[in-house]
Amino acid sequence: MTVKAPSVTSLRISKLSANQVQVRWDDVGANFYYFVEIAETKTNSGENLPSNQYRWINLGYTANNSFFFDDADPLTTYIIRVATAAQDFEQSDWIYTEEFETFATNAYTFQNMIEMQLANKFIQEKFTLNNSDYVNFNNDTIMAALMNESFQFSPSYVDVSSISNFIIGENEYHEIQGSIQQVCKDINRVYLMESEGILYLFERYQPVVKVSNDKGQTWKAVKLFNDRVGYPLSKTVYYQSANTTYVLGYDKIFYGRKSTDVRWSADDVRFSSQDITFAKLGDQLHLGFDVEIFATYATLPANVYRIAEAITCTDDYIYVVARDKVRYIKTSNALIDFDPLSPTYSERLFEPDTMTITGNPKAVCYKMDSICDKVFALIIGEVETLNANPRTSKIIDSADKGIYVLNHDEKTWKRVFGNTEEERRRIQPGYANMSTDGKLVSLSSSNFKFLSDNVVNDPETAAKYQLIGAVKYEFPREWLADKHYHMMAFIADETSDWETFTPQPMKYYAEPFFNWSKKSNTRCWINNSDRAVVVYADLKYTKVIENIPETSPDRLVHEYWDDGDCTIVMPNVKFTGFKKYASGMLFYKASGEIISYYDFNYRVRDTVEIIWKPTEVFLKAFLQNQEHETPWSPEEERGLADPDLRPLIGTMMPDSYLLQDSNFEAFCEAYIQYLSDGYGTQYNNLRNLIRNQYPREEHAWEYLWSEIYKRNIYLNADKRDAVARFFESRSYDFYSTKGIEASYKFLFKVLYNEEVEIEIESGAGTEYDIIVQSDSLTEDLVGQTIYTATGRCNVTYIERSYSNGKLQWTVTIHNLLGRLIAGQEVKAERLPSFEGEIIRGVKGKDLLQNNIDYINRSRSYYVMKIKSNLPSSRWKSDVIRFVHPVGFGFIAITLLTMFINVGLTLKHTETIINKYKNYKWDSGLPTEYADRIAKLTPTGEIEHDSVTGEAIYEPGPMAGVKYPLPDDYNAENNNSIFQGQLPSERRKLMSPLFDASGTTFAQFRDLVNKRLKDNIGNPRDPENPTQVKIDE
């Protein structure tokens, strides 16, 4: 037979928003799993669906006692059901939540550094409308920008383009830096590269490189290559893609990247995906700064091997040219040589086809450049003989001179400059060079010469001197100067697709001779004084927070979601070297969406760093539960309807203030009624305490919350959530758990954020007891000191035990000094009426496993020691209020303390004494039948008076009739004698019976009508008082 698994209880909705819902339930035990399903309960038109037409969607299962669903639709009505299952158990019945409707938007609270402001649009899209793609920190590129000192941030800003003019930047400028040095042999063999703030000096035929991070003031030699650097015709030995530097070698092509960059193969960084390219090196070279580490990319093919004239690259291909032949290789997913007999086995291979630029094998290509994936080649002439070395042989004039552009798809080259005789004349070896800055292509030229086209008629001169005719030279705009390097260059731009070259002025001296570094967008050149010249492009102080791709496990920028709460992490952000004052830092997505603005405490310059607190936490967002507004309806009071203060208006103020039916009188009555009935007023709270048998639990519960919030105002959200979770989970049994050790520790943690040591006897693991036989033992013995001739101890708890039908007492003891031996006479120090005999000596026993059982005991005496660094005056009253196990009395103390704290003044007018007895459900049969029974409604509920709220009773049909006593009543109760009485003699008049409808757990009754009360004029005071003041 298969047992059905227990169903969940207390299924409830703990979080509800537009797109998320979280349900919780009470745990049924270990090894059980919970299946969760959801269904819509209304059609698109808003009509209710019958329950048999619900389309249940399985959301999965969980071992936790909660489930979070984050794919709900806004303004949609759902219902959720949960069932339990486990191995060897049949699935339980489904338990359903109430129907609930999601909201139109989500509600979040945010936790971030106080200096940072979030953009409203970011909050609305990312969180309120649940648009996760607006900014996705897991895969989007996040940027930071420094804003100038005049910038004032508004949360209404949406896109960075609207405020880009406030981003700190610098205009393009050049610097003449330190002197260059020979690397090994000759300074004239040196090639210069500037990349990301580091200067590199390569020397042809050498593997050693000199590097400088202080703009050429000091140089350090380091071997960065495993082979020789090549010998191009121009001073450009390297070219860069967006991520990688490629260097032309004598036999090979090298590639390099910073040692701190991503090392692993990936298409998006243009590394080969065939093998691992690098390992993380860091500063193993001990230079004190990071430099690019170079490795072999491929061996040059035979027709350009050791004779390569120039190199360039795009983001997709590397191009090498020699003797008019162009070979190329992919920058990613290049071909691999799998022939084990080949000298390049397992290396990358160039593409098999060869392109020619001019078709003339004697043509000399001096330089190649690349801009926006367009490749240009500069042909400066040809050698006299085939296969001659252009480095050592004379280069002569050629009809093939010019600038050519590549059509890679068709593998053809088209000449875009040099199509006329004059254009070809302007290209001369020693004077012609080509360069780019990433936007323009520039060509240096030989001297200008007047052509026949420049001779035009001059009618003004002919008229002045009365000549038949005159001519003159027409000067075109050629930007002439004595130094041809300085002023004029042929320049092409994007408007003509870089195919129309026109004379334009240079920005810098010898600009077409510069080398361009794409990664840092800088240009460099060795000037005539052998000094490094670097041109820094227009600069905006923006940066990518993290360059690591989303697929890398090293990526730190992430967003983490947990039950609707979001934590966004990112590394610290640092800017250096800016020369203008900055007021703050703007964070935005690469496509322009503004995220937030970090406002510096004071304006900064040169260096600034944001260090996130907590560590690397950019933002935390917490999903808030929302509740639908319910229309107000009067609260139905089922308890006693206490009198209000309105009848006393005449005694509270002089008659002169009370005019018949005046507005003031009506106001006073309304205000006094508010004091009487309004929740939270002093009279209302005091009345609840005095008039009722116990104060209203709801009000005392809210007061407890308010006290905790007062003390937790400076605690962080995690600790406040811990408080909330504790009380939510314990709200139903809070009163039964007061007094256990955990409640004391919890009190000190949430109220004072202090650890505390609690020593309680139940923490020892064992208890000790003795068995005593006595006819005079009562509960008054608890807490007393008992003694014998050989020992003494304190009594913790007493309980009955029987041996052969004879009543004995098991006495739990503590603080034992000496010995207690069976047969000894035992007495109490402050209870002379007690005498007994020890039947069994001290014996240990295991403690009860459930601490709540201690609360359920009858009168007990325990000693609890509290060890805390706080002074006792600070926590003594709170312990009594909140955790001391004094039953409902602790609420009374709470309210009385509250009245004292708020300064309520009390004047003694009378003392009322009520005498009560308690029902004891084990006190046996009553002596008489019940004198009254409750009046029930047709539905079986007790009727209540509509005015006073009191339960209505009717006379019992057998009131006053003796209750029959069974003949064997004493025998059934073992003829036990307690306080000198047999069971039949211990019966009480109103001992409750389980079928007595007049007595319930919720409706208590004055079992003894003894109330000492004076008549002082209050409503319902007795006409014949049962007590009066002395001398009254």
From Swiss-Prot:
Signal peptide (UniProt feature, chain positions): none
Pfam families (UniProt xref): Gp7_5th, Gp7_6th, Gp7_helical
Gene Ontology biological process terms in this record: viral tail assembly
GO CC, one annotated term: virus tail, baseplate
Top-rank lineage group of the source organism: Viruses
Keyword Disulfide bond: yes
Chief location: virion
Keyword Disulfide bond: yes
Cellular compartments annotated: Virion
Transmembrane stretches, start-end: none
Disordered: region residues: 1012-1032
Keywords from the named record: Disulfide bond, Late protein, Viral baseplate protein, Viral release from host cell, Viral tail assembly, Viral tail protein, Virion
Family: Belongs to the T4likevirus baseplate wedge protein gp7 family.
Job description of the protein: Intermediate/inner baseplate protein. The gp25-(gp6)2-gp7 module is involved in sheath contraction. Involved in the tail assembly.
Complex and partners: Heterotrimer with gp6; assembles as a (gp6)2-gp7 heterotrimeric molecule. The (gp6)2-gp7 heterotrimeric molecule further interacts with gp25 and gp53. The gp25-(gp6)2-gp7 module is involved in sheath contraction. Interacts with gp8. Binds to gp10 homotrimer; disulfide-linked. Heteromultimer with gp10; a gp10 molecule is disulfide-linked to gp7 and the other two remaining gp10 molecules form a disulfide bond.
Protein name: Baseplate wedge protein gp7
